[in-house]
Structure formats: C-alpha cells, structure tokens
C-alpha cells in the first residue's frame, strides 16, 4: 500500500519542482519616448531594475507586465515581430488596455503565452529601431 501511495505521488513530486511553484508577479514599467529613436523605460522585471533606452524586459510565463505609457507620437504595441504598423500583435495571454496607445496603461498577463522572445514596438518608428525585447522564460 505504501508503494502504491508513493508511486501515485511521484509524478507530482517530480513534475512540480522548480519554476512550477514560482509565484506569478506583476511588474510595472514606465514608458516615455525620446525623439524618434528610443523608448525610455523605468521599472522592474524578474532580473531586477529595468531602465534606460530600449532595454530588454524579462519575465516568467504567467507574470503580468504593466506598461504606464507617456509617449506622444509613439504608438506602443506588444508584438510577435519587430515590425511597423499594427500587425503582428500578440494574440495570447490577457491584454488590458489598448494596443497602440500613446498615453495610458497597457498590461499583458503572460499566462498561456509560449516561452520566447516578443517585442514592444513603436508602430510608426520601428524602422528607426524604437522598441525592445520582452523575454518570457
């Protein structure tokens, strides 16, 4: 009987180790724009402080990123590709707010999102490199 109980519990002990027990967190990042070349971010992510010109943002799957945007003339999108215009928007996870906002809040809950590289992009100035990477681990 003890062996049966152990065998029943074994998959749970193995399968739920490591990051499966990690709590989801919410990270707030302020976004402004400088000229036609850069977003300036200030806030936190899984690695600690996020600040400066177009930095990479790193979170775990299931975390939420809240961008507080004050970037006149720079529509802010979260995308699957670093591209101009309104295409390639993320379609997984839970978005709150409006993609393309220049002033306001855009939140992305990454529950259900595949691990990998995503992008925050100015849809008007992507050819000039305005934007950066979001890494989901």
Model-identified regions with their sequence ranges:
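Acidic, Ser/Thr
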Residues: 68-72
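Short beta-strand segments of immunoglobulin-like
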Residues: 53-58
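Short coil/turn motif common to extracellular beta-sandwich-like domains
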Residues: 59-65
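Sec/Tat signal peptide C-region and signal peptidase I cleavage site
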Residues: 16-22
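Short, surface-exposed beta-strand/strand-loop-strand elements in extracellular ectodomains
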Residues: 75-84, 134-136
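Bacterial N-terminal signal peptides
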Residues: 7-15
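Positively charged n-region of N-terminal signal peptides that target proteins for export
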Residues: 1-6
């Amino acid at each position: 009987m003890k062996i049966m109980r152990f065998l029943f519990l074994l998959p749970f002990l193995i399968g739920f180790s490591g990051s499966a027990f990690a709590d989801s967190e919410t990270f707030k990042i302020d976004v402004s724009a400088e000229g036609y070349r850069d977003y300036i971010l200030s806030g936190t992510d899984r690695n600690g402080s996020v600040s400066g010109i177009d930095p990479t943002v790193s979170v775990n799957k299931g975390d939420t990123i809240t961008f507080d945007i004050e970037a006149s003339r720079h529509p802010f999108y979260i995308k699957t590709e670093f591209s101009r215009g309104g295409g390639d928007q993320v379609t997984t996870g839970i978005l709150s707010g409006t993609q393309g906002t220049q002033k306001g809040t855009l939140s992305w809950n990454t529950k259900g999102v595949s691990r990998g590289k995503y992008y925050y992009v100015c849809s008007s100035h992507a050819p000039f490199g305005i934007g950066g990477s979001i890494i989901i681990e």
